[in-house]
Structure formats: structure tokens, C-alpha cells
Swiss-Prot record:
Gene3D superfamilies: 3.30.60.30. GO terms for cellular component: extracellular region. Disulfide bonds join C6-C36, C14-C33, C22-C54. The record marks L16, E17 as: Reactive bond 3. It comes from Dendrocygna arborea. Transmembrane segments: none annotated. It holds the Pfam family Kazal_1. This is Ovomucoid. Residues 4-54 form the Kazal-like domain.
Length: 54
């Protein structure tokens, strides 16, 4: 199972680095920071589906 450590989030700003992750909402997030901020916003209901684009 793919996991991402989001314990250091949320962060006020994310870099433009492109390392896509696919969320359980079937949405592609541009990088870990964008994904983790979304995880925090979802109160933990969003999880990582897999690394790479959906």
C-alpha cells in the first residue's frame, strides 16, 4: 500500500515541483505538498491511491 507522511502539513505554500500522486478521489495532485494539504482539508478522508497520474 502506498503511503505518504503528511504530518508536517498543512503548509501555506507549495513548490511547483511536479511529482504527481493520485488521490482516492481519483484526482491527480501535482506534488506531495498539494496532496497533503488536500488530505488535511479532507479531515483525513482523502488517501493516496498510487504514485503517478490517475
Amino acid at each position: 500500500v502506498a503511503t505518504v507522511d503528511c504530518s508536517d502539513y498543512p503548509k501555506p505554500a507549495c513548490t511547483l515541483e511536479y511529482m504527481p500522486l493520485c488521490g482516492s478521489d481519483n484526482k491527480t495532485y501535482g506534488n506531495k505538498c498539494n496532496f497533503c494539504n488536500a488530505v488535511v482539508d479532507s479531515n483525513g478522508t482523502l488517501t493516496l491511491s498510487h504514485f503517478g497520474k490517475c
